[in-house]
Swiss-Prot record:
SMART domains per the UniProt record, alphabetical: RHOD (SM00450)
Originating organism: Shewanella pealeana (strain ATCC 700345 / ANG-SQ1)
Organism domain of life: Bacteria
Subunit structure, interactors included: Monomer.
Name of the molecule in the record: tRNA 2-selenouridine synthase
Top enzyme class: transferase
Enzymatic reactions: 5-methylaminomethyl-2-thiouridine(34) in tRNA + selenophosphate + (2E)-geranyl diphosphate + H2O + H(+) = 5-methylaminomethyl-2-selenouridine(34) in tRNA + (2E)-thiogeraniol + phosphate + diphosphate; 5-methylaminomethyl-2-thiouridine(34) in tRNA + (2E)-geranyl diphosphate = 5-methylaminomethyl-S-(2E)-geranyl-thiouridine(34) in tRNA + diphosphate; 5-methylaminomethyl-S-(2E)-geranyl-thiouridine(34) in tRNA + selenophosphate + H(+) = 5-methylaminomethyl-2-(Se-phospho)selenouridine(34) in tRNA + (2E)-thiogeraniol; 5-methylaminomethyl-2-(Se-phospho)selenouridine(34) in tRNA + H2O = 5-methylaminomethyl-2-selenouridine(34) in tRNA + phosphate
Pfam families, alphabetized: Rhodanese
EC number: 2.9.1.3
PANTHER family attached to this UniProt entry: TRNA 2-SELENOURIDINE SYNTHASE
Protein family membership: Belongs to the SelU family.
Domain Rhodanese: 15-138
Amino acid sequence: MTLNKVPASEYRRILVNDHPIMDARAPVEFEKGAFPASVNHPLMEDEERKKVGTCYKEHGQETAIKLGHSLVQGEIKQQRVDAWLDFFTKNPDGYLYCFRGGLRSQLTQQWLKEAGLDIPFIEGGYKAMRQFLIETIDNAANVKPMLILSGITGSGKTDFLLQRKEAVDLEGIAHHRGSSFGRYHEGQPSQINFENALAVALLKHQDTDAKHLLLEDESFLIGRSALPQAFYSGMQTASVLVLEESMDARLTRLLNEYVHKMHSGYIQRLGEEAGFEAFAQYLAQSITGIKKRLGGKQHDELQAMITDALSIQTSQNDTRGHLGWIELLLVKYYDPMYQYQIDKKAERILFKGDHQAMHQWLDDH
């Protein structure tokens, strides 16, 4: 019997087009890492998979398969098949996979076929697609030349990147804006999910007519998400563009990012009172996170300024009091640190300019 399966040559098309994929692995496998367009509808739950795995090691494949059938039968089996049918009714162009494209994929496909749907499974499964994505990341610097966008904190690098077809937003993929204040409300993805999402973004970028791969100047870690070593090494040798901005514009931008957006986000999630408390805690923790590098005296001064600014914000509904501590943080911490880092990249700098000049330079090159 010929199996209805999708060959490895189709991986790129599936991932670039965000084809819906049903992941038939157990939840514990899915949580460790999956693909951006995948949804978990397991053949076996975690405990069932564990029992079958133990049986396989001790008694072999045939006995393990029998155990699997005995664990997933009757009403349990029907509930799972119904969930699969619902997924593929909503996503008729979807595919399914398990870990290696083996027995779990074939059994899931068979049960779906018995229920009236013939759905292709992905050859090689999660493991082979994951390897394809790892190779995509490792080879990225050889497909299109990298350009690194640097710029002092608050210069608007992210805003700029989001306007350019050449760009891949690493911080957006990591769900973390690159500073002590860079947390997203929803938290960061697992390391594997970060890498998978990065690889898919790179595949999509490669399908554009952009001449370069434009990336923000990042350290090895973006929050807790680590850039893959080969990719990071490529960034370390790439040419650099420096985005320049006035202090006033930087302060306005950071007031919006650190205060307005974060305050609003916490209130939306937690309500007025608890949201404000969480927002105040976020500011305090962000300063505490860099206490060693600030020094105790500078840290205490900033915390006092934040407390005063929060008090004014509460009593007068005025956020401008935050500008003082933001400016001090820039002048005493971020700006000297940036200057030290950019000095080390001096020989790699291709161009410096404000937003308008930078757009023009990229349009011309």
